[in-house]
Amino acid sequence: MQDDESSQIFMGPEGDQLPLVEMGSCKPEASDQWDCVLVADLQTLKIQKHAQKQLQFLENLESNGFHFKMLKDQKKVFFGIRADSDVIDKYRTLLMNPEDSGSRDEQSFNIATTRIRIVSFVVNNKLKPGDTFEDLVKDGVFETMFLLHKGEQNLKNIWARWRNMFEPQPIDEIREYFGEKVALYFTWLGWYTYMLVPAAVVGLIVFLSGFALFDSSQISKEICSANDIFMCPLGDHSHRYLRLSEMCTFAKLTHLFDNEGTVLFAIFMALWATVFLEIWKRKRAHEVQSWKLYEWDEEEEEMALELINSPHYKLKDHRHSYLSSTIILILSLFMICLMIGMAHVLVVYRVLAGALFSSLVKQQVTTAVVVTGAVVHYIIIVIMTKVNKYVALKLCKFEESGTFSEQERKFTVKFFILQFFAHFSSLIYIAFILGRINGHPGKSTRLAGLWKLEECHLSGCMMDLFIQMAIIMGLKQTLSNCVEYLCPLLAHKWRLMWASKHGHMSKDPELKEWQRNYYMNPINTFSLFDEFMEMMIQYGFTTIFVAAFPLAPLLALFSNLVEIRLDAIKMVRLQRRLVPRKAKDIGTWLQVLETIGVLAVIANGMVIAFTSEFIPRVVYKYHYGPCRTNRTFTDDCLTNYVNHSLSVFYTKHFNDHSRMEGQENVTVCRYRDYRNEHDYNLSEQFWFILAIRLTFVILFEHFALCIKLIAAWFVPDVPQKVKNEVLQEKYDRIRHRMRFSSRSTDV
């Protein structure tokens, strides 16, 4: 047993002295030499069972080459841990070819982050059953574990400040402090934000171009002057005939984002998404090559950590169980059906809300239903996010994947699929189903035979889709960001105030520093994962259905400028330190981005074809309108389009005609559809336009996908400079081995 400076003592329940662990020959260490701190309640030292478990766990760590130090305050006991230099040397040796004195691993070696990564891995992955740190936390032996912030002051000054919002990010310093995985996240986020600038500018131009035609649009003119056209009531909440001219303002607003520029913008965004990903691949290759990680192997890294943790570690064979895969598939499909069911819940809400609002806001019932429906959808998203994460975790545990990286990939796929349906199921309903299964006036489809299904706004379904996207995206970018920042900030301030008020803050500099880290907000495995997921969903809103909401890239740009600094402030000032992890790419998220890009092409093509009025306008202009027969027609080719696009319904065929308010002399009302006047069946014109819609979708998707493929081929994933550097490194290693081999032969 060493002197009191180099050892600490547990006190048993009867005052018995239990040796904690000898510090060996090491002298007391400075605060910045301790990487990880375990925390336990002070009362656990008086419980023999817990004290023995703590001692056993720490002795297990000591046998792996770790050193410890214990400090106490009035309530807690802190165990500082650091790895011995022999552990670092072992790690370096495992990842290097001993013949390559200048290997890429040595060049990319960062002792501080490596030591932290090793300590964190070993503490969390002791192999003895019932002896893992997670088990000890559940048993109350330990409370938590955290990594110490140290040397972060420069990042606070130049990065984690709101006033630095428009300053470049210090990626190299982020990498040295948080590791390559976090550095790649901020590199990707910064590049994504930069690339949003052209998309936001083009989207704004498309939106503003609608203002240029705000009053001059032929369709708007016809709607605003149609005082003699009465529209049939939309639902049970409306019992009067609206003059078409009352829709004048909404018709003009709809034209802001439902015009010819929308098609060009959708094609532009398909090209933008491809160029963004291709140039990102090049930027990623350049960054990881500068870090000497281009050929780094994640599986080798994990195996090296496992061997440091236990020299007797054995590889787990890859196994595939068709039974478990089938069960997981069925459960996943069930959850997807549940997400789709959420859309049906919203349908029911909107129908019932229409009946409720009819007595409160008679003039704007449809708008009120759309707005409140979007808010309800946002609340459902918040709730289902927690449910989806729990379900995805359970599915991954049931699957029993091997390495951590493999588990992370499978969890990412499952969680994203569930989140995608949670966020976009309602938008899919509004874009492609709303107003298309309602029947016609006098014979409407009803929910449970009582309530008439809602219909699109009289100005078109694009207005409903625009409002839904604007509200959901606006709430996610504002309310979610406020909660994401204010909750950790207030929680951190509250912990510090509580500790100071009760006199728990020590005057000892080292213990005070540990306490400062302890009172920061806790982190978990999903801290960085959640940031990525948030950005993936935002990217989906920015590309999918962007034809209906050209301002989405602009909102995303403003949000990301805030998001970068918000995440920086959280990680440096408000949260405990993340485990520095190595990485050479953003992993499965790249495949997620590519999938979203393909879905965006399909969705935007269908929105233009089926949701907007683009195809009916084009068909009328060249097949039914005045320009078809009269090439010298001087007026607008869309003249009389509004009257042509509205079907006729005779009010005498209403079952409840007596309930209509006013306009008793109205014998004919109009509604949005293409139906015959005599029997209300779908007209020949409907089927002709449907054929054109389907043709457009096929042509648009093939054209957009061809552009994506050409752009992907034209822009190489890896710069030639990086290829040459990697090739030179391989050449140098081979030459070095040749010299090494020659020396060995000579001996």
From Swiss-Prot:
Changing residue 245 to A: Loss of activation of its channel activity by cAMP-dependent protein kinase A (PKA). The term 'anoctamin' was coined because these channels are anion selective and have eight (OCT) transmembrane segments. There is some dissatisfaction in the field with the Ano nomenclature because it is not certain that all the members of this family are anion channels or have the 8-transmembrane topology. InterPro entries: Anoctamin, Anoctamin_TM. PKA-activated nonselective cation channel. Discriminates poorly among cations but is more permeable to Ca(2+) ions than to monovalent cations. Acts as a calcium-activated calcium permeable channel which may operate as a endoplasmic reticulum (ER) Ca(2+)-leak channel, reducing the loading of the ER Ca(2+) store. Regulates intracellular Ca2+ signals, ion channel activity, and cytokine release in the renal tissue. Plays an important role in olfaction, amplifying cAMP-evoked cyclic nucleotide-gated (CNG) channel currents in the olfactory sensory neurons. Residues 1-193, 281-326, 386-414, 565-595, 717-747 are cytoplasmic. The chain crosses the membrane at residues 194-214, 260-280, 327-347, 365-385, 415-435, 544-564, 596-616, 696-716. GO terms for molecular function: calcium channel activity; channel activity; chloride channel inhibitor activity; intracellularly calcium-gated chloride channel activity; phospholipid scramblase activity. Residues 215-259, 348-364, 436-543, 617-695 are extracellular. Cation channel activity is activated via phosphorylation on Ser-245 by cAMP-dependent protein kinase A (PKA). Inhibited by NaCl. It is found in: Cell membrane; Endoplasmic reticulum. Highly expressed in the olfactory epithelium, particularly in mature olfactory sensory neurons (at protein level). Expressed in the kidney (at protein level). Predominant expression seen in epithelial tissues. Highly expressed in the small intestine, colon and stomach. This is Anoctamin-9. Phosphorylation on Ser-245 by cAMP-dependent protein kinase A (PKA)is essential for activation of its cation channel activity. Glycans are attached at residues 630, 643, 665, 681. Belongs to the anoctamin family. GO terms for biological process: calcium activated galactosylceramide scrambling; calcium activated phosphatidylcholine scrambling; calcium activated phosphatidylserine scrambling; establishment of localization in cell; lipid metabolic process; sensory perception of smell. It is a multi-pass membrane protein. Disruption phenotype: Knockout mice show reduced olfactory behavioral sensitivity, electro-olfactogram signals and neural activity in the olfactory bulb. Conditional knockout in olfactory sensory neurons results in impaired odor discrimination. Keywords: Cell membrane, Endoplasmic reticulum, Glycoprotein, Lipid metabolism, Lipid transport, Membrane, Phosphoprotein, Transmembrane, Transmembrane helix, Transport. Pfam families: Anoctamin. One of its GO terms (cellular component) is endoplasmic reticulum. It catalyses: a 1,2-diacyl-sn-glycero-3-phospho-L-serine(in) = a 1,2-diacyl-sn-glycero-3-phospho-L-serine(out); a beta-D-galactosyl-(1<->1')-N-acylsphing-4-enine(out) = a beta-D-galactosyl-(1<->1')-N-acylsphing-4-enine(in); a 1,2-diacyl-sn-glycero-3-phosphocholine(in) = a 1,2-diacyl-sn-glycero-3-phosphocholine(out); Ca(2+)(in) = Ca(2+)(out). The modification Phosphoserine is found at residue 245.
